[in-house]
Design a protein with these regions (language model features):
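Hydrophobic faces of well-ordered beta-strands that scaffold small-molecule active sites
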Residues: 2-6, 40-44, 72-75, 94-98, ...
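Active-site mouth loops of central-metabolism enzymes
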Residues: 3-29, 53, 97-103, 127-135, ...
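Alpha-helix-loop-beta-strand connector modules within alpha/beta enzyme cores
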Residues: 6, 51-91, 174-193
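Active-site-proximal loop/turn and secondary-structure-junction residues that shape catalytic pockets
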Residues: 8-10, 46-50, 78-80, 100-102, ...
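Glycine-rich, proline-tolerant flexible connector loops at the mouths of alpha/beta enzymes
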Residues: 35-70, 163-171
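A structural motif
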Residues: 36-39, 69, 91, 118, ...
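Active-site-proximal beta-alpha core segment in soluble small-molecule metabolic enzymes
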Residues: 84, 90-122
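Catalytic alpha/beta core domains of metabolic enzymes, predominantly
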Residues: 108, 114-259
C-alpha cells in the first residue's frame, strides 16, 4: 500500500491561514510530521487560494523539497497549474494529481506525464460527475488505455481513482464504489483514492475513515491519500497490508512497528 500524506491542503482552514500568512515554518513542520508517520509521498494542494494557487504551489513545492526527499504529489484541478509546477519538482517519483476523464484535462496531463516520466492520477469523473460502473466505466477505461498506448505511457504509471463520494450525501454509494474499484482493477490499472472524502460533513470522521480503508484494500486498492497523523489509521493500513500482501507485507509491518 502506497500511502500519501494529505495534510498540506488549503481546503483545511488552518492550512489556508498558514499559506495566507506565509507561515512556512508550521507548514514544513507538518511535512516532516507526515514523513515521520511513515508516508511514501507528500500531497501539496493550494486549490483554495484562488488566483494565488499556482504561485503558492510553486513556493510550497520548493520549500518542501528543502526539508524532505520524499516524492511530491502536486494536486490541482487545473491542468495549467500542474504544467507550471511540475518542472519545479526535482525529486524522483513525482505524481500529478489529477486529470479527469474529460479530454480537456486528460489529453494535456497524459502528455505531460509521458514527457516527465511521472505518475498520473486519473479521477473517474466526466462532465463533473462520477463515471458509473458497468458499460460507462468500461468505455472510459478503454479510451484511457488507447490514449496511454498512443503516448507510450506505461499503464503502471497511471493510477485510476474510483472517486470516494461523501457518505453524508451519497449514503448508498459504497457498494457502487467497490464495484468501480473492482472494474478498474480488472482492466489492469492500479487504483488510488482520497480516503477522507467518505467522512466529509459527518461526525466522528476518523471512525468512518478507519472503517473504509481495509474494505478498499481487500478489494484491491493500491494507494491512498490519507491523514497519517491518525496513528490508529496508519496502524490499520500497515496491518491490513501485512494480512493481504503476498510479498513483503509482514516484514514491512515489522519495520514500521520498529520505527515508531
Amino acid at each position: 500500500m502506497y500511502i500519501i500524506g494529505e495534510n498540506i491542503n488549503s481546503s483545511n482552514g488552518r492550512i489556508r491561514s498558514a499559506l495566507e500568512k506565509g507561515d512556512w515554518d508550521s507548514l514544513m513542520e507538518l511535512v516532516c510530521t507526515q514523513e515521520r508517520a511513515g508516508v511514501q509521498a507528500i500531497d501539496l494542494n493550494t486549490g483554495a487560494m484562488g488566483t494565488r494557487e499556482t504561485g503558492l504551489l510553486l513556493e510550497l513545492a520548493e520549500r518542501t523539497q528543502q526539508v524532505t526527499d520524499l516524492p511530491l504529489v502536486i494536486d490541482s484541478a487545473r491542468a495549467q497549474t500542474l504544467e507550471d509546477a511540475a518542472p519545479k519538482c526535482r525529486q524522483k517519483g513525482l505524481i500529478l494529481n489529477s486529470a479527469t476523464m474529460d479530454d480537456a484535462s486528460l489529453l494535456p496531463l497524459t502528455e505531460l506525464a509521458a514527457q516527465l516520466g511521472s505518475r498520473l492520477v486519473v479521477l473517474s469523473l466526466k462532465n463533473g460527475s462520477a463515471v458509473k460502473g458497468g458499460d460507462e466505466m468500461a468505455e472510459e477505461l478503454k479510451k484511457l488505455s488507447e490514449r496511454l498506448k498512443a503516448l507510450n505511457l506505461p499503464r503502471n504509471r497511471v493510477w485510476v481513482d474510483p472517486v470516494v463520494l461523501p457518505l453524508a450525501y451519497y449514503p448508498d454509494d459504497v457498494g457502487e464504489l467497490l464495484a468501480r474499484l473492482e472494474q478498474i482493477k480488472a482492466a489492469g490499472f492500479s487504483a488510488i483514492c482520497g480516503l477522507s472524502n467518505i467522512s466529509f460533513d459527518m461526525p466522528r470522521r476518523r471512525a468512518l475513515n478507519r472503517a473504509l480503508l481495509p474494505v478498499l484494500m481487500a478489494h484491491g486498492l493500491d494507494a491512498v491519500i490519507m491523514d497519517p497523523t491518525d496513528r490508529v489509521l496508519m496502524d490499520m493500513a500497515k496491518a491490513a497490508d501485512a494480512l493481504l500482501s503476498e510479498g513483503d507485507g509482514v516484514m514491512d509491518y515489522l519495520r514500521y512497528l520498529r520505527s515508531l
